[in-house]
Amino acid sequence: VASKEKGISIIDVRHEVTAVFAADAVTRLSNKPGVAAVTAGPGLTNTITAVKNAQMAQSPVILLGGATATILKGKGALQDIDQMALLRPHVKWTGSVNRVRDIDGVIDKAFEQAYKGTPGPVFIEFPVDLLYPESVIREWYGLTSGKRS
């Protein structure tokens, strides 16, 4: 709903690589930023061909990727891979959101980097727990008042 109010079109696709190819096409045809959002782990690995294509075409695509919850990072959780290391060779810049209050700044930086100098794709990682209210996260992990229950 909020995206419609801001004039942002959401287009759902069946495969992550298609999302990035579509974002690249939007950028090339309209000179407006193309943005793709994909799920963590295998969803992100599926984008590599299209990301590399955008890099070689100097296309400023913004790729948003989910990530495992911050509390589970590096512990072998479902879809927990080093996404930043995977994408670094193929994008101009990578960023990760570590706190909700940093979302705006990281997104602003991503758009700046995508267009600065030679244009190219950028990647932002969004851990899943930052996209939900704190109360939901505490319930997921059995936390109350900052202590494990």
Enumerate the language-model features and the residues they cover.
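N-terminal alpha/beta PP-like core and its mobile active-site loop of ThDP/TPP-dependent enzymes
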Residues: V1-S149
